[in-house]
Amino acid sequence: MSHKDLTSGEPAGRPKPRVAVLFGGRSSEHAVSCVTAAGVLGAINKDKYDVIPIGIAKSGQWVLAGGDTAQWSLAGKALPEVAPSEQTVTLAEIGGEHQLIVAAPNEVPQELGTVDVVFPLLHGPFGEDGTIQGLLELSDTRYVGAGVLASAVGMDKHFMKVVFESAGLHVGPYVAVTDRQWQKDPEAVRKQVDRLGFPVFVKPARAGSSMGISKVDSLEGLDAAIEEARRHDLKLVIEAGIVGREIECAVLEGRGTDAPRTSLPGEISVAGGGHEFYDFNAKYVEDDAASLSCPADIPDEAIARVRELAAAAFDAVGAEGLSRVDFFYTPDGDLIINEINTMPGFTPKSMYPQMWAKSGLGYAELIDELIHLALNRKTGLR
């Protein structure tokens, strides 16, 4: 497909750019992705864009996901899921253009039309880790969000910390544990963790939405926490517990050569209910389990520093589009970077869009800006 007509955000020969919204996926965060899609599909400006929702079943099958977007929302504690279908969606090049094709057994394939930009709302492995980005790069299809390398680094908490440290950003003490290390010499791992001091947080290195994370207060609970994390990823990161307030900042790519834009920082407060930290249920299931204060009640100089460091973290991993950067603000005023999320939760109640709303950029406008950035960013080396 020729991209020369897309730089204005309005391709010639058709009144509206066509946006394929991808969600679901093969990871344990499948349901979170569906909930994110419900928010985006409900808010995207359909007068401006021709929107095609495409669900990815847990098997990896791509299906056309039409109908009421409410089907992807949380219903109580029931988690939504993309069901497999006899009809399969593929992205193919036909006549020099990228077309979505729907095919079913014993039926003639149907063309859904040219895709101008893909909005991948995929969380976790096989989506947020550079894999879907690599597929879209190979097909020369523009897409929202970070590229292959930034997505991969942002997914791996170990290499993320290595990159941050090399950029001079302050990260907390941690131990990275591979499958081989744990299988070969678990006692050596226990000694490393014991030197960190307790409590510690045991995390899968390449999972999000707080999946598989445990807080461990003593050596006795370590093995069980490690095995729980290994259910999600055989590579782990074990972090020393840090006394501090949880501060977040939303980052949005600048236009052209402009610097990344940052929101007012927000503070996460977990309101008990059995939650020792900001876990999956507090994030997505229980409406009153956590709250966001934005702007965070910290000194003005700390707010400025959070925004500066968030932009630096965005640049350090080479992010594009959007990211959320999380910090600990310690009692002595130090800021310790916890992580960057290159595809943060994007439901209307998620912290990323909430912080932008508090900063003057509404949910629908934020979606529009991300699509604009993607339409005006070429694939390939940049």
UniProtKB/Swiss-Prot annotation:
* EC annotation from Swiss-Prot or TrEMBL: 6.3.2.4
What this chain does, per the entry, is described as: Cell wall formation.
Top-level class of the enzyme under EC nomenclature: ligase
Identify the GO cellular component terms for this protein: cytosol
Cofactor dependency = Mg(2+); Mn(2+)
InterPro entries of this UniProt entry? ATP-grasp, ATP_grasp_subdomain_1, D-Ala_lig_Van_CS, D_ala_D_ala, Dala_Dala_lig_C, Dala_Dala_lig_N, PreATP-grasp_dom_sf
Pathway field of the UniProt record reads: Cell wall biogenesis; peptidoglycan biosynthesis
* Annotated positions binding Mg(2+) 1: D326, E339
| Coiled-coil spans in chain | none
Please verify whether the record's keywords include Manganese: yes
Taken from the record, one Pfam family name reads Dala_Dala_lig_N
Cofactor stoichiometry and binding remark: Binds 2 magnesium or manganese ions per subunit.
Q: Where does the UniProt entry say this protein principally localizes?
A: cytoplasm
Compartment(s): Cytoplasm
Q: Which family does it belong to?
A: Belongs to the D-alanine--D-alanine ligase family.
Domain ATP-grasp spans what residues? 161-372
Query: What name has this protein been given in UniProt?
Result: D-alanine--D-alanine ligase
Q: What are this entry's molecular-function GO terms?
A: ATP binding; D-alanine-D-alanine ligase activity; metal ion binding
NCBIfam families given in the database record? D_ala_D_alaTIGR, PRK01966.1-4
Instruction: Report which gene this protein is encoded by.
Output: ddl
Q: Which residues take part in binding ATP?
A: 193-248
